[in-house]
């Protein structure tokens, strides 16, 4: 999401744990807020929050949205509503043309992925239920 936002001209502030700092910056965020050590509220007002965490962080993030801004949550209804802004739940809809554009961005090197683990289909449950903290997404290989 960070890379797409930057491609369309957004100034991106990423958040996470200190261990995530370099990864977030490598994926094109211009600033990083360490949620364990920095005051999220020091960011100031923003136009858009893309919430992938929810809970207290989601609620605090909603408070940063300026009038007319938007909170987008992929973790379901957050219960947080930005004052003077809009809150929407992120819904994925199949769109062949958009998927083709995303694939082309990956092929062109304009959109990078962060793959942390590749597992075969027989090991999918164990790979997805792992309690081990991983960097990157888990890919399940359907065919050997």
Residue ranges of model-derived segments:
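Terminal helix/beta-alpha structural elements that buttress the NAD(P)+-binding lobe
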Residues: 1-144
């Amino acid at each position: 999401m960070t890379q797409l936002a930057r491609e369309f001209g957004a100034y991106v502030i990423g958040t996470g744990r200190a261990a995530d700092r370099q990864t977030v910056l490598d994926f094109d965020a211009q600033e990083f807020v360490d949620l364990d050590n920095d005051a999220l509220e020091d960011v100031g007002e923003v136009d858009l929050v893309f919430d992938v965490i929810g809970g207290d962080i989601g609620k605090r993030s909603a408070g940063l949205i300026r009038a007319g801004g938007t909170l987008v949550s992929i973790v379901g209804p957050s219960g947080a509503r930005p004052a003077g802004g809009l809150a929407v739940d992120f819904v994925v809809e199949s769109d062949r043309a958009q998927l083709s554009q995303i694939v082309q961005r990956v092929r062109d090197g304009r959109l990078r992925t962060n793959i942390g683990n590749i597992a075969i289909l027989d090991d999918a449950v164990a790979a997805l239920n792992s309690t081990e903290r991983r960097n990157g997404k888990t890919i399940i290989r359907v065919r050997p």
